[in-house]
């Protein structure tokens, strides 16, 4: 099972990249628009990977932001929501908008996404109602870490880029991990 890939971006399309690893192997990885907006061609990056193996295909989906990866993995568990539709949701909604729409039960936010109709929007809200707490806690931890790092004098733009790559789950660990990357 592939969980992460580090390499140079040798090809970049809006929702697909090719990463060439140091061993010379290149991997094709599907990414969201938010993800692809955070790096350039010929840049070295590391993507967390969700690997989906089916009878007729083997696809890799990459994420810089662990919250976006969690969102994708929650969505693909819903009946009728495949990886392509889940990635369309990740490209159209940031995790905060996604959580807010879930919390408020706002189907209209989901229906704006290509491939999501009224039935799918209702299904997303119904099936992910249990997941709301995990998403909320994750967003609160990131918000608290952001506030703490801002108070230390770091620029918000730099902090947000670093927090997207952090894998820690609670505020204090996020701050420690971010400080190592910002220093």
From Swiss-Prot:
Region (Flexible linker): 138
Keywords carried by this UniProt record: Cytoplasm, DNA damage, DNA recombination, DNA repair, DNA-binding
Signal peptide segment: none
Region (Domain II): 65-138
One example of a Gene Ontology biological process annotation: DNA repair
InterPro entries (alphabetical): DNA_helicase_Holl-junc_RuvA_I (IPR013849), Hlx-hairpin-Hlx_DNA-bd_motif (IPR003583), NA-bd_OB-fold (IPR012340), RuvA (IPR000085), RuvA_2-like (IPR010994), RuvA_C (IPR011114), RuvA_C_sf (IPR036267)
Gene Ontology terms, MF aspect: ATP binding; four-way junction DNA binding; four-way junction helicase activity
Pfam families for the chain: HHH_5, RuvA_C, RuvA_N
Database matches in NCBIfam families: ruvA
Protein function: The RuvA-RuvB-RuvC complex processes Holliday junction (HJ) DNA during genetic recombination and DNA repair, while the RuvA-RuvB complex plays an important role in the rescue of blocked DNA replication forks via replication fork reversal (RFR). RuvA specifically binds to HJ cruciform DNA, conferring on it an open structure. The RuvB hexamer acts as an ATP-dependent pump, pulling dsDNA into and through the RuvAB complex. HJ branch migration allows RuvC to scan DNA until it finds its consensus sequence, where it cleaves and resolves the cruciform DNA.
Oligomer and partners: Homotetramer. Forms an RuvA(8)-RuvB(12)-Holliday junction (HJ) complex. HJ DNA is sandwiched between 2 RuvA tetramers; dsDNA enters through RuvA and exits via RuvB. An RuvB hexamer assembles on each DNA strand where it exits the tetramer. Each RuvB hexamer is contacted by two RuvA subunits (via domain III) on 2 adjacent RuvB subunits; this complex drives branch migration. In the full resolvosome a probable DNA-RuvA(4)-RuvB(12)-RuvC(2) complex forms which resolves the HJ.
Domain notes: Has three domains with a flexible linker between the domains II and III and assumes an 'L' shape. Domain III is highly mobile and contacts RuvB.
Protein name: Holliday junction branch migration complex subunit RuvA
């Amino acid at each position: 099972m592939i969980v992460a890939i580090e390499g140079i971006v040798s090809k970049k399309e809006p929702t697909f990249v090719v990463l060439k690893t140091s061993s010379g192997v290149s991997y094709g990885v599907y990414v969201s628009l938010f993800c692809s907006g955070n790096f350039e061609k010929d840049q070295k990056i590391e993507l967390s990977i969700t690997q989906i193996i089916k009878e007729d295909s083997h696809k890799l989906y990459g994420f810089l932001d662990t919250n976006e990866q969690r969102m994708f993995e929650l969505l693909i568990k819903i009946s009728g929501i495949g990886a392509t539709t889940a990635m369309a949701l990740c490209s159209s909604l940031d995790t905060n908008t996604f959580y807010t729409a879930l919390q408020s039960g706002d189907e209209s936010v989901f229906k704006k996404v290509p491939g999501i109709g009224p039935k799918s929007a209702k299904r997303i809200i119904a099936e992910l109602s249990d997941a709301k707490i995990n998403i909320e806690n994750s967003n609160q931890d990131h918000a608290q870490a952001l506030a703490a790092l801002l108070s230390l004098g770091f620029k918000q733009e730099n902090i947000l880029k670093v927090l997207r790559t952090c894998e820690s789950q609670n505020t204090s660990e996020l701050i420690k991990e971010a400080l190592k990357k910002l220093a």
